[in-house]
From Swiss-Prot:
It is found in: Cytoplasm. This is Acetyl-coenzyme A carboxylase carboxyl transferase subunit beta. GO terms for molecular function: acetyl-CoA carboxylase activity; ATP binding; carboxyl- or carbamoyltransferase activity; zinc ion binding. Its main location: cytoplasm. Residues 28-289 form the CoA carboxyltransferase N-terminal domain. Gene3D superfamilies: 2-enoyl-CoA Hydratase, Chain A, domain 1. PROSITE patterns: COA_CT_NTER. Its cofactor is Zn(2+). Pfam families: Carboxyl_trans, Zn_ribbon_ACC. Zn(2+) binds at C32, C35, C51, C54. Keywords: ATP-binding, Cytoplasm, Fatty acid biosynthesis, Fatty acid metabolism, Lipid biosynthesis, Lipid metabolism, Metal-binding, Nucleotide-binding, Transferase, Zinc, Zinc-finger. Signal peptide: none annotated.
């Protein structure tokens, strides 16, 4: 009928068949969790895993992080063979550790070593949240403490990139002890004139944020990083108040004086280079044996 000509027609979208979907290999495309844009993974990797549309910083693994800041081929790893055991006989802990080792090809949640940034020697530690959510157990604490001691021995700056859910519950009090161990190592290093740069990435929470992550001479963070001790819900229930939407973000902490700078990932290497250049040789005269 004539009136049918003026009826708004329904719009339809073609849904790709399973066969079409299978034609795109896994890993070729990546969807941004913030803006939902789908992009080529190689394009994302080229931009240091920062979304080209909205600037969201996707998580980096330890090796990607090291490659992004150190001179090519300069990294030498420390304590690679150190692995966690199960001192408290926590159920299924060994199995979970083994699964993470296979999945990440790491022995623990932190990689430590030395390398150069524009030919300036540094000791560096990078946490990897893929391994037990970057949680700090006995081995993580020991590796970080040893790295700090190595920086003290070499009289060079120490840089750490944190990404952690906090202390590792499967190791109980032994895990909590690492907060004190790492902090004491850094205090000794600081008293001797050492330069410590802490870079907090998403997420840095719990016992890690409450210990070594916040002790830097320079405390930096990546945009949008979640940084805090207790979870948002726990705090709201405790204080019985609604918290700001941007609470515990890097930008919130910067605004309230708890960070020195929020640094875009594409500018991180250059920012570190400038800090090192400013302090190069300066602290050596005050080192105490």
């Amino acid at each position: 009928m004539l009136r049918d000509l003026f009826v708004k027609k329904k719009k339809y979208a073609a849904i790709p068949s399973e066969q079409v979907r299978k034609d795109v290999p896994d890993g070729v495309m990546t969807k941004c969790p913030k803006c939902k844009k789908i992009m080529y993974t190689k394009e994302l990797l080229k931009n240091l895993k920062v979304c080209v549309n909205c600037g969201y910083h996707h998580p980096m693994n330890a090796w990607e992080r090291l490659d992004s800041i150190l001179d090519e081929g300069s990294f030498r790893e420390y304590d690679k063979e150190m692995v966690s055991v199960n001192p408290l006989q926590f159920p299924n802990y060994e199995e979970k550790l083994e699964n993470d080792r296979k999945k990440t090809e790491l022995n623990e949640a932190v990689v430590t070593g030395e390398g150069t940034i524009d030919e300036m020697l540094v000791v560096v530690a990078v946490m990897d949240s893929r391994f037990r959510m970057g949680s700090m157990g006995s081995v993580v604490g020991e590796k970080i403490a040893r790295a700090v001691e190595k920086a003290y021995e070499l009289q060079v700056p120490f840089i750490i990139f944190t990404a952690s859910g906090g202390a590792r519950m499967q190791e109980g009090i032994l895990s909590l002890m690492q907060m004190a161990k790492t902090s004491v190592a850094l205090k000794k290093y600081s008293n001797a004139g050492g330069l410590f740069i802490s870079v907090m990435t998403h997420p840095t929470t719990g016992g890690v944020s409450a210990s070594f992550a916040s002790l830097g001479d320079y405390n930096l963070a990546e945009p949008g990083a979640l940084i805090g001790f207790a979870g948002r819900r726990v705090i709201e229930q405790t204080v019985r108040e609604k918290l700001p939407e941007d609470f515990q973000t890097a930008e919130f902490l910067l605004e309230h004086g708890q960070l020195d700078a929020v640094v875009h990932r594409n500018e991180m290497r250059e920012s570190l280079r400038k800090i090192l250049e400013v302090h190069q040789g300066e602290g050596m005269a005050v080192w105490q044996n």
